[in-house]
Each structure stands twice: as C-alpha cells, then as structure tokens.
Amino acid sequence: MRVTATFDKVADIIAETSEIDRETIKPESHTIDDLGIDSLDFLDIVFAIDKEFGIKIPLEQWTQEVNEGKVSTEEYFVLKNLCAKIDELRAAKAG
C-alpha cells in the first residue's frame, strides 16, 4: 500500500529532522500534539518532504484553513492524513 511507503519515508524524515525516536512515530501521531514538533522543525520537515517527493505542500493554505476553522488540525497534522495528502499531491503532479 502506498500510504505505508509514504509513511515510512515521512517518519524517517521526521526522525532525522527533529531527533524524535523513529519507533515512537506512528500513523496516528499528531505532529504537534503527540510528537511535540515545533513550527520551525515542521517547516524543515515540510521542506524535506517537498524535496523527497518532488511536490510542494501548500502549508500556507493549510495553516490558513486551520486558523479559520475550516478544518481541524488532525486533517493535515496527523501523519496518516498528512501521508494521504502527500499521495494526493503526487498523483495530481503525475497527472
């Protein structure tokens, strides 16, 4: 399943970028609430994800949607949901 491969790569990136133990990173983990990733580390993680997958995560748009109450933080910041969004962006780019 592609989400698993995507999750494994994203979890590796998070572990490398934030020094969080790879074993503690789960698909259900919330990057902020559960893993304690701060905004600067998250920007580094997003940059690494963009580079790894050849996509551009619309972080400004996502943040705005969360701040305006259009979506919950879980929509974008729980890893299994983030990985699904990454796969959607990859599919859209592939056409």
Swiss-Prot record:
The gene it comes from is: acpXL
Residues modified as O-(pantetheine 4'-phosphoryl)serine = S39
Q: Which UniProt keywords apply?
A: Cytoplasm, Fatty acid biosynthesis, Fatty acid metabolism, Lipid A biosynthesis, Lipid biosynthesis, Lipid metabolism, Phosphopantetheine, Phosphoprotein
Q: What is this protein called?
A: Acyl carrier protein AcpXL
Q: Name one GO biological process term.
A: lipid A biosynthetic process
**Which superkingdom, per the lineage?**
Bacteria
Question: A Pfam family this protein belongs to?
Answer: PP-binding
Q: Name one GO molecular function term.
A: acyl binding
The function of this protein is: Carrier of the growing fatty acid chain in fatty acid biosynthesis. Is involved in the transfer of long hydroxylated fatty acids to lipid A.
Report the coiled-coil segments: none
Q: How is it modified after translation?
A: 4'-phosphopantetheine is transferred from CoA to a specific serine of apo-ACP by AcpS. This modification is essential for activity because fatty acids are bound in thioester linkage to the sulfhydryl of the prosthetic group.
Q: Where in the cell is it found?
A: Cytoplasm
> So, what pathway does this thing act in?
Glycolipid biosynthesis; KDO(2)-lipid A biosynthesis
Q: Which SUPFAM superfamilies match?
A: ACP-like
The keyword Lipid metabolism is annotated on this UniProt entry: yes
Task: Give the main location.
Answer: cytoplasm
Q: Where is the Carrier domain?
A: 4-90
